[in-house]
Amino acid sequence: MNILMVGDVVARPGRRVLRERLAELQDSLEIDFTVVNVENAAGGFGITANVLAEFRALSIDVMTTGNHVWDKKEALTFIDDNPDLLRPHNYPAGTPGSGWVVRESAGGVRVGVLNMMGQAFMHPVLDSPFAAVDQVLEQWQKETDVLLVDFHAETTSEKIAMGWHLDG
């Protein structure tokens, strides 16, 4: 299975490149499943309904975010209606949206995508991503064939620590 994960798509130039190149890249690499981080897609901060509609026209399976997810407050009005648009899972309970989703690829592979956010130098400071990831991994191992974690963090040390944590 070939998976494409695209980092932060930033503002109009990033959306243009994605619109112009994504299908070609997916075809040339025989991509089966695509995840794109969209947290900076609207003017460099957040996502709007219009920008989300642009992404809907592309072949994207899941969209992730990070600390800028709420920079455009209108995201609060549509995130619950878009289960493939994730916000970090380690936001407190009751936060709109979801931090994880299980989708089936075109080939029938069950892919779980978990969106997490680090704590170091991030605002707001969320619940421990390590504890939060442990809460879902055991359940997911029964429900998915592939587990992807998009860990949005500032420091290399926290990213490496999460890598070691997830490696078992």
Predicted regions and their residues:
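Acidic, metal/ion-coordinating pockets
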Residues: 1-168
